[in-house]
């Protein structure tokens, strides 16, 4: 590049311009001219793509500041001098670098000598401590092995042994409390006892058996302590408001694994609650509630039904409360028979109140407050027996047995009272009253029956039991009543007796019609009423026929035989007698109500009276029809029969209807 620059600088400016114009205007005359080739090369060079050229020009511009002939001629020398100065400077700098490197080399040589010395010494030391290294390696391996064994031992102990704190919790002190941590420790013992069975299937059977025995002893110790604590807690539950703690509930859950201790604890709870319930019952009877509200139950002893009802209601509430307490106590117990345990303990708790309850109810029943009250008390006892049995659920419970005994006693006294009443009816039978209405004894007995049935209808005794009682009550009352009425009317005439019986039976029927389960009895009474109605219907028809003079004529016609001759030839059946009878019959037809038996006016039921009149009228019409047919029959030799009987049977029916 220096040579090129020098040559370029030596060419005059005008010449260069002429050369360029000549080269551009025509084909070069001397293509092989070196200068021309260089110029063409320079002119064809693309400086933007030649980075080295650009850098060289930039460097040249730094010291080539004046473009003159002199500077162009001396350019080569200037560049060489500058290059020499730069090289001298480079040599000077590298001399310093060399000196530094030599210093470093000396240091490195010293360090190398030191390292060789140390290596030699270490090699010597290594040769001298070879045995120690071997021993150290062995000890390290042994230490690692022992650490692994220690970890295994720690894991084994944590898996199959209790901590000292857990041991202290399980053994505890005699009167110490039981906390949540106790149950966690007990659960840990159970878990270890189950997990140790894995060891029995390995070569560690001896260790497994020892651990199992140790855990079994700890379990027994813990259960014994838990049992004593639970017993103490149960003995303290003597307040009416029994608050079962969560810890005691957990204790019962844990004790279910020891059925004997579990049973003893339940018995202790039942004994404590039994004394509480007995004390509460006696207080309710004699002292009442806090501050005298509610009042003592004994204050209502003058009202037998309320007295018995209040006692039973208190016991029902107490029984339900005790069952709730037991359910709270055993809510976490999962063993079979929990329901039976609750029923058994509730039965034991309520057993203590049976004696005072029985004595008081017996006093009420044996005082014979009356059949109605006895029946209400009987139904009340039956209802509470059914209700409490839903809580106790065991028919063998003493409380249920006592209530059932009192129910049977009240029922027995009730039916004895009814039987006594019935016997009194038969011992002193009253004559029917002059109006042939029901007797006072019948009215009183039916009032009693109505009150009994009304109390029975309003009771909450189960349906099947109510129906059975109904049948027995009706048999005990109605059968003697019917017998009394029959005996009482036995000395009366036919119509009077039938009227009295219809009135009595009608009153019985209207009384029973108000109540359920009486359909069968109502049917029986209706059959008897209809039998006596038939009698009254016949009597009324006979009464009418007798009063109008047709009775003899009708009876004779019915009994007449053809071999006796014609009816007209028989005594009192001639035309004159028939015309006289027809005259009376016409008066009857004009006012039939004037020929009613007096007994019909004594009937209590207007419907029955109308029925008798209607059906007896039909009998009269039928009798007239037979008389009319006989008179109109030529065989009977009546002359001009139309003048004797001038009305046809249809006309008679029309007039009487």
Curated annotation (Swiss-Prot):
DNA repair in keyword set: no
Location in or out of the cell: Golgi apparatus membrane
Domain of life where this protein originates: Eukaryota
GO terms under cellular component: Golgi membrane; Golgi transport complex
A biological process from GO: retrograde transport, vesicle recycling within Golgi
A Pfam family annotated for this UniProt entry: COG6_N
Sequence ranges of Low complexity compositional bias: 14-26
Region (Disordered): 14-36
UniProt membrane topology term: Peripheral membrane protein
Keywords from the UniProt entry: Golgi apparatus, Membrane, Protein transport, Transport
The keyword Membrane is assigned to this record: yes
InterPro entries in the cross-refs: COG6, COG6_C, COG6_N
Similarity comment: Belongs to the COG6 family.
Its job: Required for normal Golgi function.
Quaternary assembly: Component of the conserved oligomeric Golgi complex which is composed of eight different subunits and is required for normal Golgi morphology and localization.
Protein name: Conserved oligomeric Golgi complex subunit 6
Organism name: Rattus norvegicus (Rat)
């Amino acid at each position: 590049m220096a040579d090129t620059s020098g040559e370029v600088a030596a060419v005059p400016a005008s010449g260069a311009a002429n050369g360029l114009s000549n080269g551009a205007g025509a084909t070069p005359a001397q293509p092989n001219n070196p200068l021309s080739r260089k110029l063409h090369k320079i002119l064809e060079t693309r400086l933007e793509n030649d980075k080295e050229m650009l850098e060289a020009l930039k460097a040249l511009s730094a010291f080539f500041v004046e473009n003159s002939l002199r500077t162009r001629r001396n350019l080569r020398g200037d560049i060489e001098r500058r290059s020499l100065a730069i090289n001298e400077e480079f040599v000077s700098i590298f001399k310093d670098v060399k000196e530094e490197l030599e210093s470093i080399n000396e240091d490195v040589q010293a360090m190398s000598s030191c390292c060789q010395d140390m290596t030699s010494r270490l090699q010597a030391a290594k040769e001298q401590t070879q045995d120690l290294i071997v021993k150290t390696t062995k000890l390290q391996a042994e230490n690692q092995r022992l650490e692994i064994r220690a970890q295994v031992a720690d894991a084994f102990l944590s898996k199959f042994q209790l901590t000292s704190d857990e041991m202290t919790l399980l053994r505890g002190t005699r009167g110490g409390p039981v906390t949540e941590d106790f149950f966690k420790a007990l659960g840990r013992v159970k878990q270890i006892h189950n997990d140790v069975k894995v060891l029995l299937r390995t070569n560690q059977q001896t260790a497994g058996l020892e651990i199992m025995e140790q855990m079994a002893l700890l379990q027994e110790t813990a259960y014994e302590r838990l049992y004593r604590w639970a017993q103490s807690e149960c003995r303290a539950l003597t307040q009416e408001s029994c608050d079962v703690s969560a810890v005691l509930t957990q204790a019962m859950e844990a004790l279910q694994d020891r059925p004997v201790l579990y049973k003893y604890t339940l018995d202790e709870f039942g004994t404590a609650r039994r004394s509480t319930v007995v004390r509460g019952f006696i207080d309710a009877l004699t002292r009442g509630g806090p501050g005298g509200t509610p009042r003592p139950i004994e204050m209502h002893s003058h009202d037998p039904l309320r007295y018995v009802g209040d006692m039973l209601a208190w016991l029902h509430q107490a029984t339900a409360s005790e069952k709730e307490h037991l359910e709270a106590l055993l809510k976490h117990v999962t063993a079979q028979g929990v329901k039976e345990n609750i029923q058994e303990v509730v039965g034991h708790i309520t057993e203590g109140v049976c004696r005072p309850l029985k004595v008081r109810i017996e006093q009420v029943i044996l005082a014979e407050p009356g059949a109605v009250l006895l029946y209400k008390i009987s139904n009340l006892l039956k209802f509470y027996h059914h209700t409490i049995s839903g809580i106790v659920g065991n028919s063998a419970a003493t409380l249920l047995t006592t209530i059932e005994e009192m129910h049977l006693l009240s029922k027995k006294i009730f039916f004895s009272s009814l039987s006594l009443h019935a016997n009194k009816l038969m011992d002193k039978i009253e004559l029917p009253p002059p109006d042939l209405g029901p007797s006072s004894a019948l009215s009183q007995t039916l009032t009693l029956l109505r009150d009994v049935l009304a109390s029975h209808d309003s009771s909450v005794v189960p349906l099947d039991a109510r129906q059975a009682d109904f049948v027995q009550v009706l048999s005990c009352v109605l059968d003697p009543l019917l017998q009394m009425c029959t005996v009482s009317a036995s000395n009366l005439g036919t119509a009077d007796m039938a009227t009295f019986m219809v009135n009595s039976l009608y009153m019985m029927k209207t009384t029973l019609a108000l109540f359920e389960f009486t359909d069968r009895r109502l049917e029986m009474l209706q059959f008897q009423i209809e039998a006596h109605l038939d009698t009254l219907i016949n009597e009324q028809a006979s009464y009418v026929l007798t009063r109008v003079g047709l009775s003899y004529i009708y009876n004779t016609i019915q009994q007449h035989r053809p071999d006796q001759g014609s009816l007209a030839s028989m005594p009192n059946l001639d035309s004159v007698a028939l015309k006289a009878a027809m005259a009376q019959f016409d008066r009857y037809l004009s006012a039939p109500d004037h020929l009613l038996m007096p007994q019909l006016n004594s009937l209590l039921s207007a419907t029955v009276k109308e029925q008798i009149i209607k059906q007896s009228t039909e009998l009269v019409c039928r009798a007239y029809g037979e008389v009319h047919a006989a008179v109109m029959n030529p065989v009977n030799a009546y002359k001009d029969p139309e003048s004797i009987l001038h009305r046809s049977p249809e006309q008679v029916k029309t007039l009487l209807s």
